[in-house]
Amino acid sequence: MIGYISDNLLIPILDFFYGLVPSYGLAIVALTIVIRVALYPLSAGSIRSARRMRIAQPVIQKRQAEIKSRYANNLQKQQEELGKVMKEFGSPLAGCLPLLVQMPILFALFATLRGSPFADVPYTINLKVLPADQIAAVEPKPFNSASHSIFIAETDHVPVIASLPRGTKLGVGDSATVNLHTKDGRGFDDVLTAVDNPSRFAPTWSITKGDDVVNVSDDGTITALTAGDATVEAKIPGLAARSGFLFIKALGQVGFYADGDINWDIAILVGGFGLTLFLSQLLSGMGMPANPQQATANKITPVMITGMFLFFPLPAGVLLYMVIANIFQALQTFLLTREALPENLQKILDQQMTQQTVPVTATSAGGGDARLPFEPKGGK
């Protein structure tokens, strides 16, 4: 499903924007905005639901406890009263459905930006090498990888599959050649004959596991050396993987630290992601009663995620998408938190805000201890 959405929805939109402005960086920005605008009603529903639940949750929990205590011996009446509470305030799970609906599209967008033309496309083949006397009893089962759209020109791409006709089980001393071809069986080498400078799309071959078990040549021929497990990986270079955008040196560049150098463009993108995530969380609590636990989580979460992405191998193009998406999310959150609440929730919110301000006001009016709640009793 992810691949279908990517090939039939997202890549055509990407082609359209690249045709308007020949910049893959701008195409990523435009694609991100279009998808986020299209998903606005769904994400807005989730934000509204989360905002309302944050206000109503203390009241819901209090009423649920009272109902369970009052009707402890009458489960039918208990369920009936609990249902009334859910009907009045809504289900806490109501905000999850819009998120689930939009997840396939967001995953497809993420997968699109991790593939061609923005990054090198890997094909992974897991092999099992058996002794010669055992391989004869194995029935060959053809292997076909997942299809990936490979851009061979700015707006021209073909679906490419890696296959082994006799499967991934080899006998010691056997050889097999990995075929790269389109869905209709046309060889990838044949496709490249119509491309300028076809050598830039030449796949690179490597052994990521079991380099003592198999050997692989530059044409994709695998030779089994000894019994064991091995993994061979082919990578087809991405057309735009080395293209830059603004301060980004290469959209396909991966990693904050590589080859002994710091990639400052990646560092800036990761920092921008953390900052926009923090801003979005800060805006989600705007106009709400103070919640120390939530405030702490809002500070720690962006730092943890930002630190993780510094060392998580994401291409610069994906990080650019994440920053733009976070900016859109922050703007959307700001607009939605300014919406009027239902009357019953507004009353609850007013009471919560009053309860927080009354103790401080009363203490100050009485001329007593004017310390703030978090200050030690020993004085300032």
UniProtKB/Swiss-Prot annotation:
| Molecular function per GO | membrane insertase activity
> InterPro entries, from UniProt?
YidC/ALB3/OXA1/COX18, YidC/Oxa/ALB_C, YidC_ALB_C
Organism the protein comes from: Parasynechococcus marenigrum (strain WH8102)
Concerning its family, UniProt says: Belongs to the OXA1/ALB3/YidC family. Type 1 subfamily.
Q: What is this protein's function? A: Required for the insertion and/or proper folding and/or complex formation of integral membrane proteins into the membrane. Involved in integration of membrane proteins that insert both dependently and independently of the Sec translocase complex, as well as at least some lipoproteins. Aids folding of multispanning membrane proteins.
Q: What is this protein called?
A: Membrane protein insertase YidC
* Annotated TM spans: 9-29, 93-113, 266-286, 304-324
PANTHER family in UniProt: CYTOCHROME C OXIDASE ASSEMBLY PROTEIN COX18, MITOCHONDRIAL (PTHR12428:SF65), OXA1 (PTHR12428)
Q: How does it assemble?
A: Interacts with the Sec translocase complex via SecD. Specifically interacts with transmembrane segments of nascent integral membrane proteins during membrane integration.
Q: What is its main location?
A: membrane
Which compartments is it annotated to reside in? Cell inner membrane
Q: List the disulfide bonds.
A: none
Keyword Transmembrane in annotation: yes
One GO cellular component term noted in the UniProt record for this chain? plasma membrane
- Top-level taxonomic group: Bacteria
Membrane topology note? Multi-pass membrane protein
Keywords annotated in UniProt: Cell inner membrane, Cell membrane, Chaperone, Membrane, Protein transport, Transmembrane, Transmembrane helix, Transport
Q: Report whether Calcium shows up as a keyword of the record.
A: no
